[in-house]
Regions:
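Cytosolic, long alpha-helical scaffolding segments
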Residues: 1-222
């Protein structure tokens, strides 16, 4: 049986989540985080540029993310059930992985939701101010995902504090965009779609916060 984790005698609680994964598992974890980051950036660009083909490619990319998540969930569950020689630290890493994967999958889903609206041409119907706010939300969303990736992939726990602050900016932008929607500068159907869009970006930030908290909690005291 292929081992996802080595059989070390001493637990290593401070290691990054994927630091001890073997070569069959680590690339998949790294790839998932990269795909989600690309999906969010691509969805925002497609929305603002009106590139419907790019939007459709982001939607298709979500299928790859879902497939990778399912593959890792199955592998992690198999290890927990069949590999009796895992030490405590490795078991905790696997359990943490099983907890963060749904957050990652949902983050990819949010990028897909944005891309679907881009494919329908929502971007061209936005007011200038709402467009500027959406552009900034996209930039902040990409930044917070990079920070979350650093925490999970590289174990840079110091980035967790920055994630909380970045999420606060996303929350503020969400409030600002919601206020803009009540100004009457856009039709009601467009305003409704933009309200959903703002919520998608805000929820994306929340998932990043949850990812960081799970990693920090894993390395914290029991």
């Amino acid at each position: 049986m292929n081992r996802l984790f080595g059989n070390r005698s001493e637990p290593d609680e401070e290691a990054p989540l994927v630091a001890t994964a073997d070569e069959a598992m680590r690339p998949q974890i790294v790839q998932i985080f990269a795909l989600v980051g690309e999906a969010m950036a691509g969805a925002t660009h497609a929305l603002l540029s009106g590139d419907r083909e790019l939007a459709k490619s982001v939607v298709d990319k979500d299928k790859a993310i879902d497939a990778l998540v399912n593959s890792l969930v199955n592998a992690a569950e198999l290890q927990l059930v069949e590999n009796e020689s895992l030490n405590i630290a490795d078991r905790r890493r696997l359990l943490t992985l099983l907890r963060i994967l749904p957050e990652v999958e949902r983050s990819g889903d949010l990028a897909e939701h944005i891309a679907r609206r881009a494919a329908r041409g929502l971007g061209v119907e936005m007011s200038p101010r709402s467009r500027g706010l959406v552009e900034r939300m996209g930039e902040v969303a990409s930044t917070i995902w990079r920070e979350a990736t650093d925490v999970i992939i590289d174990g840079k726990l110091e980035a967790a504090g920055a994630i909380e602050e970045i999420d606060d900016e996303l929350d503020d932008l969400h409030v600002s965009l919601t206020a803009e929607l009540t100004s009457g500068s856009m039709t009601l159907p467009v305003a409704v779609e933009l309200a959903l869009l703002a919520r998608f970006y805000e929820r994306f930030g929340d998932h990043c916060v949850n990812l960081a908290r799970r990693q920090v909690g894993r390395n914290g005291p029991d």
